[in-house]
């Protein structure tokens, strides 16, 4: 079985941060939201999923969960699993029928 996984920069696996390829863009996906600073001191934020639904879910999660409480986020990255819990085939906002589960942060 083929799987996608998130890893730390040193190549070690992040616990539970993986999914079988067969479910990605179907009824599940996983995404990362990461903030970092480059050598010139500029801040960058990345939001992306294993597939397009994960990337879409990342934007919705940032808008509804992270941004309203951004001053309380003291981590550089989070990994979240999205599940199409209501089975409608659409990426819903958090709290509107789909499940968003925080998997890891650092």
Predicted regions and their residues:
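Solvent-exposed alpha-helical segments and adjacent loops
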Residues: 1-106
